[in-house]
Amino acid sequence: MSRMACKLSYDGTAFAGYQVQPGKRTVQSEVERALQEIHKGARVPVVASGRTDAGVHACGQVLHFDTELTIAPERWVSALNTHLPDDIVVTNAAMVEPDFHARYGAQAKEYRYYIQCGPFENVFRRHFAVHIKQALDVPAMQTAAKHLLGTHDFSAFCAANTTVTDKVRTITHVAVQPSEEGLLISIRGTGFLYNMVRIIVGTLLEIGTGKRVASEMKVILAGKSRNLAGKTAPAHGLCLYEVDYGQPLFVNETPGQVSMN
């Protein structure tokens, strides 16, 4: 029995999220269906680095599964892609140690949120970037984002219906930078709460549009209440960009190998 790790990109538009849900199309169900076909009907469960919500994309999702088949990593890539739908692509594969765990072994994750700015929406990007008509105060957003760095209780930036009790997380990098189409917000941390990135982005957008001032970010963090933060930003602007395991998993690995840019 061997343990394989795979890197996935997927367009989340037509999925009800990553995790299996009865009667709904999900990324996990499609991957497990493909593996079942390759294994001649035998069920092969997969474990991912984490779940993504309906409409959220990924270019750096990582999963693992156990197999009795003797197939080279590069052949796993082609075999899986042959059986997967067009909106999921395996971009890399590797044989890993038996104790490797895609979820519990992850040391950090990076998410990126894409924003179109301007009077007209680029219809070819409408499923991958959120459109904001008004001009954004980028320096104010950058100032506010700095308050997120470090270890904090992120209760204010967590969905109210979560069952998680420990809401302390560490953010190691956050950037708000102009891009060709508008704005790119990237956030890297050791772990994230449910809807955390989207609530942070929603709050930053309210600061960028003048509904709030940059100094409010510090107050919101200290208040630890979901009611203090901004709205949850739409799912389709978000992409799981990279999962870091402390050392490269794959040959010729580069972050964001299939880019959303």
Swiss-Prot record:
Keyword tRNA processing attached: yes
Catalysis performed (reactions): uridine(38/39/40) in tRNA = pseudouridine(38/39/40) in tRNA
Alphabetized GO MF terms: RNA binding; tRNA pseudouridine(38-40) synthase activity
Keywords in alphabetical order: Isomerase, tRNA processing
Highest taxon, organism lineage: Bacteria
Residues reported in the UniProt entry to bind substrate: 111
Enzyme class: isomerase
Active site: 53 (nucleophile)
CDD domains on file: PseudoU_synth_EcTruA (cd02570)
EC id: 5.4.99.12
UniProt keyword tRNA processing, yes or no: yes
Biological process (GO), any one: tRNA pseudouridine synthesis
Family the UniProt entry places it in: Belongs to the tRNA pseudouridine synthase TruA family.
Protein purpose: Formation of pseudouridine at positions 38, 39 and 40 in the anticodon stem and loop of transfer RNAs.
Subunit structure: Homodimer.
Designated name of the protein: tRNA pseudouridine synthase A
Organism: Shouchella clausii (strain KSM-K16)
